[in-house]
């Protein structure tokens, strides 16, 4: 939706009743909260349609592996993070998205 749509919130609202699985990530492929996606707008739109399906983070920050090769990740966007640091980034992003979702429910 980020690339194809003029207004992501409206696109989400138009998908009401059809949206069954929502993948999230930043425009720069990093975890949510480390880019410039309009998370307030996105979470408000999901709240507006009462979306209660899966929300799955899909950051692609390290080259290598089958997925990294398939999507052509050619540089390390993690800052050289090890597995523990990657886990910490994922936990931070989860807290960020949960907070944005909570704020959107108000």
Go through each PLM region and give its residues.
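Histidine-acidic metal/acid-base catalytic patches
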Residues: 1-106
């Amino acid at each position: 939706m980020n690339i194809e749509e003029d207004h992501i919130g409206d696109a989400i609202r138009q998908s009401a009743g059809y949206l069954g699985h929502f993948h999230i990530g930043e425009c720069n492929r990093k975890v949510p909260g480390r880019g410039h996606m309009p998370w307030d707008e996105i979470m408000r739109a999901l709240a507006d349609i009462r979306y209660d399906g899966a929300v799955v983070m899909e950051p692609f920050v390290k080259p290598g592996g089958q997925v990294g090769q398939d999507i052509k990740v050619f540089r390390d966007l993690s800052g050289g993070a090890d597995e523990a640091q990657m886990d910490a980034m994922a936990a931070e992003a989860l807290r960020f998205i949960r907070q944005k979702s909570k704020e959107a429910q108000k």
